[in-house]
């Protein structure tokens, strides 16, 4: 999945789609001053290369709570193995493997503190997890 074939136009397309994954190809083409067919081919190439993994939405419900959970793992169990188990837990939105004091960063979503705690407890119960540090997200800015 090398990025050797990525040029400025591809980066601009990615930037536009990151802001709004539903942007019509015609609008992207107009902004880049190319044909819609050229945009379609470039996006298909980005998907084929694994650069665009999926088209999704980010949402925030009024009564929903989100938290960042930083996870420390033991070296005896590979971090990807732990990360995959965490990703399967209900309430887990996204899992990142990281460097530093914590090996994994998890974004958790729930309807209340009890559901957030339940998800964190489930993360802690995974073999190889030796510690967590959690922070509630107050506001999100895009």
Swiss-Prot record:
Organism: Saccharolobus solfataricus (strain ATCC 35092 / DSM 1617 / JCM 11322 / P2)
Domain HTH asnC-type stretches: 6-69
Function description: In the absence or at low concentrations of lysine, activates the biosynthesis of this amino acid via the alpha-aminoadipate (AAA) pathway.
Record's protein name: HTH-type transcriptional regulator LysM
Keywords recorded for this protein, A-Z: Activator, Cytoplasm, DNA-binding, Transcription, Transcription regulation
A GO BP entry: lysine biosynthetic process via aminoadipic acid
Location in or out of the cell: Cytoplasm
Pathway involvement of the protein, from the record: Amino-acid biosynthesis; L-lysine biosynthesis via AAA pathway [regulation]
Subunit relationships: Homotetramer.
Encoding gene (name): lysM
SMART domains for the chain: HTH_ASNC (SM00344)
Main location: cytoplasm
Highest taxon above the source species: Archaea
UniProt-listed CDD domains: HTH_ARSR
Gene Ontology MF term list: sequence-specific DNA binding
InterPro entries: ArsR-like_HTH, AsnC-type_HTH_dom, Dimeric_a/b-barrel, HTH-Lysine_Regulator, HTH-Siroheme_Decarb, Tscrpt_reg_AsnC-like, Tscrpt_reg_AsnC/Lrp_C, WH-like_DNA-bd_sf
Annotated GO CC locations: cytoplasm
DNA-binding region(s), chain positions: 25-44
């Amino acid at each position: 999945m090398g990025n050797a074939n990525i040029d400025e136009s591809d980066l601009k397309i990615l930037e536009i789609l990151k802001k709004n994954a539903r942007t019509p190809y015609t609008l992207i083409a107009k902004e880049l001053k190319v044909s819609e067919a050229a945009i379609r081919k470039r996006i298909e190439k980005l998907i084929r290369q694994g650069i665009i993994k999926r088209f999704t939405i980010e949402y925030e419900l009024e009564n929903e709570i989100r938290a960042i959970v930083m996870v420390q793992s033991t070296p005896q169990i590979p971090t990807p193995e732990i990360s995959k188990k965490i990703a399967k837990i209900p309430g887990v939105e996204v899992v990142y493997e990281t460097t530093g004091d914590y090996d994994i960063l998890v974004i958790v979503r729930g309807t209340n503190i009890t559901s957030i705690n339940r998800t964190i407890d489930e993360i802690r119960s995974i073999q190889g997890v030796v510690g967590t540090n959690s922070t509630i997200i107050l506001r999100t800015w895009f």
